[in-house]
């Protein structure tokens, strides 16, 4: 099923994190942690403005991942991890900061999602046979301690594909689609 996410259509200047969190009807503690993470992300992006190509896209990616995971009834730790993952992916925070600011559980989830990114070493443009790709998928599932990492990574890939439509050249779009088709779509099917 394909759905258009509300956050995907928002004008970033008009986005109000408190209203958005309220619209999700989350428990108060989860809502507060997401709001705090949003402002944390904004501060980290501002600190690294010189190396950020598209700060708005980074923030929107976290919001959209949270929406996807919320629809899947994922827990508050998963939602918080999703909000923070774009910071990790863009290397705007280090592990000590995450550990100090969000604790060991969130740090472990973020590391698990980041480890799944190692799969990109198998370039979609290389002609891998079906058994090689299947072995890679099995390796992905085996290397994570927490299944939530896989779900969060799948949400991240969905947002990645949506962003690719507007920000990639045709060749990059094809490579992104092949990667998701070969690795992540069958992985999602297995779950």
Label each region the model flagged.
Residues 1-191:
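Active-site helical microenvironments for divalent-metal-assisted chemistry
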């Amino acid at each position: 099923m394909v759905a258009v996410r509300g956050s995907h259509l928002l004008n970033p200047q008009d986005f109000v994190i408190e209203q958005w969190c309220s619209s999700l009807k989350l428990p108060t503690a989860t809502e507060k942690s997401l709001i705090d993470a949003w402002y944390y992300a904004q501060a980290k992006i501002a600190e690294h403005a010189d190396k950020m190509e598209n700060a708005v896209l980074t923030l929107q990616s976290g919001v959209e991942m949270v929406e996807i995971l919320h629809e899947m009834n994922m827990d508050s730790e998963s939602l918080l991890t999703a909000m923070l993952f774009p910071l990790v992916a863009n290397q705007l925070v280090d592990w000590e900061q995450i550990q100090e600011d969000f604790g060991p559980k969130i740090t472990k989830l973020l590391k698990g999602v980041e480890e799944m990114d190692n799969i990109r070493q198998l370039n979609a443009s290389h002609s891998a046979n079906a058994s090689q790709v299947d072995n890679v998928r099995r390796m992905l599932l085996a290397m994570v301690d927490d299944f939530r990492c896989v779900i969060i990574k799948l949400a991240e890939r969905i947002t990645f594909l949506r962003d690719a439509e507007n920000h990639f050249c045709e060749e990059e779009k094809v490579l992104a689609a092949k990667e998701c088709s070969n690795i992540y779509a069958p992985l999602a099917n297995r779950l």
